[in-house]
Design a protein with these regions (language model features):
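Extreme N-terminal starter segment of soluble prokaryotic enzymes
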Residues: 27-31
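Short, Lys/Arg-enriched N-terminal segments with co-localized hydrophobic residues
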Residues: 15-26
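Gly/serine-rich nucleotide phosphate-binding loop at the start of the catalytic core
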Residues: 33-44, 49
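Glycine-rich phosphate- or other oxyanion-binding loops that anchor nucleotides, phosphorylated ligands
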Residues: 56, 60-286
């Protein structure tokens, strides 16, 4: 369990030790952040649990190929995302009931999930990789993503015939519902919007951890959506009871939204099947 700062010890232990022609190689440790269980579900379906013989089983630790994965479901909104990232990356203690984490600094952070398209050139279900993420506040700097990790991710997807567009994203505390909202955000230079990436990238940068964002476009500027902003609490997180009321008052729009989200996530799942076991996250080893 993480208590305080991330341990600096990067010794080789357990399943992270492999010998190849006399060389000792360490598995890459990747923290994968998702806002909801639905968005994190592909990771659990693709990866496997701790291998047999692991003497230190850890709740939430998965394996895919030569990568050790920890799925962190942080919740909707920038405040929850920031708090969960600070916990996971060791800046604040984990609650006693929370998951324990590997006792070493991750090699990379990967943020996954849905995003909204701000440009008509981005169709629904398009996979996107962020180059940078902008804040809403003009007094904050953009957060760049790892060029090395992002390039590897995009190259692997293209090599398997899957289109992945490099984009600038922006993180908003509110859901961009109307076309006018999305066009206003597009003036920043961003092509997609989400509610969590900027805060997680900022914490990862503070921790000195390479980070990338891989999302899928769930809606476009012309999409007609239910007003889920009415279901957000003061912290920008989704209130389940209020969300139910929105669903009851806009049943057709909500059904279309859920169907579209499910379809988009199926496309992202195909991308993650290629990325999670791949050698994309070794920037910190070089």
């Amino acid at each position: 369990m993480v208590q305080g700062g991330i341990p600096g010890d990067r010794a080789l232990t357990g399943e992270s030790r492999e010998s190849v022609e006399g060389l000792v190689l360490r598995m890459s440790l990747v923290y994968i952040f998702a806002a909801s269980k639905m968005e994190g579900q592909p990771v659990e379906q693709i990866a496997v649990g701790n291998p047999e013989g692991d003497s230190t089983p850890r709740l939430g630790t998965l394996r895919s190929g030569d990568n050790e994965l920890v799925l962190v479901v942080g919740g909707w909104g920038h405040k929850k995302a920031a708090a969960k990232a600070r916990e996971a990356l060791g800046f604040t203690p984990f609650p006693s009931e929370s998951q324990s984490l590997p006792g070493r600094k991750p090699d990379a952070v990967l943020i996954i999930g849905l995003c909204g398209g701000l440009s008509s050139s981005l169709p629904q279900n398009r996979i996107v990789a962020y180059t940078d993420c902008l804040p809403i506040e003009s007094n904050k700097p953009p957060q760049p993503c790892s060029v090395t990790v992002t390039n590897k991710v995009v190259e692997i997807l293209y090599s398997h015939g899957m289109t992945c567009e490099r984009v600038v994203g922006i993180t908003s505390p509110r859901i961009a519902i109307r076309r006018d909202d999305k066009l206003a955000l597009a003036k920043s230079g961003a092509k997609v919007v989400d509610m969590e990436s900027y805060e997680i990238l900022a914490v990862a940068a503070q921790a000195g951890v390479s980070a990338a964002v891989l999302r899928v476009v769930a809606d476009t500027p012309d999409s007609i959506m239910p007003d889920l902003n009415r279901a957000l609490n003061q912290d920008g997180a989704l209130d389940d009871r209020k969300a139910l009321w929105v669903a009851l008052t806009s049943p057709i729009r909500m059904a279309r939204l859920l169907s579209g989200n499910k379809r988009a996530m199926s496309h992202l799942a195909k991308a993650l099947e290629l990325i999670l076991p791949a050698d994309c996250f070794t920037e910190a080893h070089n």
